[in-house]
Amino acid sequence: MLITSIEAHEILDSRGNPTVEAQVALENGTTGSAIVPSGASTGEKEAVELRDSDPKRYGGKGVLSAVANVNDSIAPEIIGMEVTDQRSIDRKMIEIDGTANKATLGANAILAVSMAVARTAALSLGLPLYRYLGGTNASLLPVPCMNVINGGKHADNTVDFQEFMIAPHNAPNFAEALRMGAETFHALKSILRGKGYSTGVGDEGGFAPDLKSNEEAVEVILLAIEKAGYRPGEDISICLDPATSEMWKDGKYLFFKSDQSTKTSEEMVDLWASWAGQYPIVSLEDGMGENDWEGWKMLTDRIGATVELVGDDLFCTNAKILAEGIEKGVANSILIKLNQIGSVSETLDTIELAVKHNYKCFVSHRSGETEDTTIADLTVATAAGQIKTGSGCRSERVAKFNQLLRIERQLGEAARFAGKSAFAR
């Protein structure tokens, strides 16, 4: 089915900042749309998110230039192409851009069209998006890793590390895992309130209290797991994303929100090894900075046999960078963010490379999200087994969980739940 029109518009994300929505229409009248997210803590090697830098509009964060690139540069070249030829469409947009990091058109322009094309193709064939992208065997529901305490760049508090997540893995299905996570989220709220802490939430829906230390964040989560009636490590484990690239200053890690202390790479590895021995941590994302490859190698050698070590800023969903990490024996898992690389095809290529080399894949939202649920379908399509998309509140986060509930119902008896094997080393 041929594409007859492509239109882009400027709309708002969950932080009130502009983002790009694209709509694709076909000759049979089918239409589909998609909206791109935006990150706060971003890797240096991410594809370029094009902003207008006009101080008179949205504080310089407008995306009218990216919208114009879709309507004026991309649409004329893509109209008339077969909507199911995702790879050719993505390749054409990359060729038009002409840069390695999509700096001309903007990854937000290219990805909006790429995602909208995939969704419209699925609709035209009468298929759910997960089935269209993943084929007949797509049936694995992920563990919902829920970000219940926010720190770092995601919250205005004294916690250095960015995300403290719960992973409810000992469940018979996704729906029950989500229930376990939501109950723990509410138990945590009760505990924080009882301790006199604020229960306001950060960008991703997690609480953002002024805790006394980073360790206290883990300890109150463990209390919440027990208060909700579950066993830490047996039913629900902990995933961390300290986002240490944001802490990397002058060759050391600066604890910039708490006590202003610093640690060397060796000391950070010691810290994570200590935490892994003390707490039920199944996954550690960006435990070292994106440019600290020696530190990453030390961390992988030290705890990589027992803990999932996820490269986010390190790899930026980029197959070429992942290949370098594989060759060097760095990390054992990769975070998947569509807008880090900027097209559906390239994202699928990166996932394929990771799976080929026994690296786990962990699909992720961004801190500036929307009601778009593409990543829920992508997670099932690729059998990733893990997704992080915020906490148990904020509708732009819950939208992804609700889509996964729908997918599980659609699959019926064919649905499988990843469980703790999603993190297994």
UniProtKB/Swiss-Prot annotation:
Localization annotation: Cytoplasm; Secreted; Cell surface
Superkingdom of the source species: Bacteria
Cofactor(s) the record lists: Mg(2+)
Textual note on the cofactor: Binds a second Mg(2+) ion via substrate during catalysis.
Record keywords: Cytoplasm, Glycolysis, Lyase, Magnesium, Metal-binding, Secreted
Catalytic activity entry: (2R)-2-phosphoglycerate = phosphoenolpyruvate + H2O
Single annotated GO MF: magnesium ion binding
Class in the EC hierarchy, top level: lyase
Pfam families named in the record: Enolase_C, Enolase_N
Active site: 204 (proton donor), 337 (proton acceptor)
Compositional bias annotation for Basic and acidic residues: 43-54
Pathway this chain belongs to: Carbohydrate degradation; glycolysis; pyruvate from D-glyceraldehyde 3-phosphate: step 4/5
UniProt family annotation: Belongs to the enolase family.
Entry function: Catalyzes the reversible conversion of 2-phosphoglycerate (2-PG) into phosphoenolpyruvate (PEP). It is essential for the degradation of carbohydrates via glycolysis.
PANTHER family: ENOLASE
HAMAP family registered for this protein in UniProt: Enolase (MF_00318)
Protein name as annotated: Enolase
Lineage: Bacteria, Bacillati, Cyanobacteriota, Cyanophyceae, Gloeobacterales
